[in-house]
Amino acid sequence: MERRIFRLFASSTGAILCVSTSAFSATAQGTTPIQPGVITSFAPIVEKVAPSVVTVFTTQTVSRGGSAFPFSDDALRQFFGGQLPQTQGKQTLQGLGSGVIVSPDGYILTANHVVSGAEEIMVGLGVDPRKYKAKKIGTDPGTDVALLKIEEKNLPAITFADSDKARAGDIVLAVGNPFGLRQTVTMGIISAVGRGGMGIVDYENFIQTDAAINMGNSGGALVDIKGQLLGINSAIFSRTGGNQGVGFAIPANLAREVMQSLRDKGRVVRGYIGASVQTLTPELADAMKLKGQSTGALVGEVAPNSPSQKTGLKTGDVIAAVNGKKITDARELRLMIGSMAPGSKAQLEVNREGQTKTFELQLAEMPPGTTEEGGPEASPEETTQQPEKTTVFGGVAVADVTDDIRTALNLPKDVHGAVIAEIDADSPGGKAGLREGDVIQEVNKQPVRTAKDLVAISKNLKPTDKILIRVYSQGRSGYVALEPK
């Protein structure tokens, strides 16, 4: 996903009327006084919260050089239709964000993307012009949470709210330092809770708000009307580059859980079952002929020697529930398993080809970098022959996975199939999300080892057949459903 999702823009909530319709009663003489208990100002809340919100300054030196295209060989570039743009030089980048003091002895929560790659981090307290050097205690890209520490005492720590109790419609305030303007406060409501599936981070459970979250607000506080921390402001969605009133905050309960792990261990420890999953869509369920099952987490890949493999989980299984709690999508499964301690037991309810099965497994600890895609870079051979291309599915050109292509695409040795060399964006495959460089491994549960295998399978398909494709893409295997023409 483009980094623009982390770009924070200005927005306006307009005039806010902080009284109920019963606060005034029209009379011939005018209006009656405001009734006791009606909130007419959030100033007391802001005065309580603002000292806990800090400015985070970062410095980073970036090197720009080499190719933006992974293939240095002309034949491979021609094969994939790529170009070879060049950029050179170094640049020092100054970053600006916000943070929240969470303990009197100097621990500060912020967003990971605010401090990611920073060589120096400084913190400004309130409107004090002085800056304090901050140490990075730990980061968690999976949730976009980072924990910093400054060597100061008796700091005004914020109070945490129970973000699980947050509801759409609740009034919230966003406090941060947009564009370097310290102690800026905006107001809105919670638009939704439990937002995910946007590809911002691996573990998404965002609070959505229409409170203005601007550039520099990332890492700042989203608070309730009691002045308690509901979330850490993280991102805003925009198609135009301007504000559209759709901001996202990391729930306080999740941020606190990550913070405690970072503070105690310097890293986040998560449960792990060793299965790559995706959300089961109605189209996939239809292609897989799963009657009565339209939601869940579809297993696209099972890691060797993992808890999933040891207990008998297979690709194509649909995880419908964990410990009796229904799973509606892959996001829910990741959050649930990730929040469980390694060594704990998990009972999985699984739909396998229409049959319900139950598996009990013991969670392992998630290995570092498990969600990273690909592996170490390798240099292609100096000379490469272009493999022959064959077109299938009305606009998908495929070829065999040669040694050169395997090296260029950084494909694991156990990934076999037909690589997509070219694809028509308007073809069924293009519309389903297939892209150049993907490797087709199965079609309707029939294995594909070569382009010839794929051609043979495709010839036996009827025009009205739904097509279920297992594909290796961006470091993972998953499923794609192609609708008939």
Predicted regions and their residues:
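Catalytic-histidine neighborhood of serine endopeptidases
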Residues: 103-105, 109-143, 150-154, 163
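Flexible, gly/ser-rich surface segments that form the specificity/activation loops bordering the active-site cleft
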Residues: 114, 158-162, 170-204, 239-241, ...
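Catalytic nucleophile loop of clan PA
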Residues: 100, 212-232, 429
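A conserved glycine-rich beta-strand in the N-terminal activation segment of trypsin-fold
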Residues: 34-44, 63, 86-105, 130-133, ...
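Short, conserved beta-turn/loop elements at beta-strand boundaries and strand-helix junctions
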Residues: 61, 104, 119, 139-143, ...
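N-terminal targeting leaders that route proteins to membranes or the secretory/organellar pathways
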Residues: 1-74, 93-94, 107, 120, ...
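Active-site substrate-binding loop(s) of clan PA
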Residues: 45, 124, 135-137, 154-181, ...
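C-terminal recognition in membrane/secretory proteostasis and scaffolding
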Residues: 2-10, 26-32, 40, 44, ...
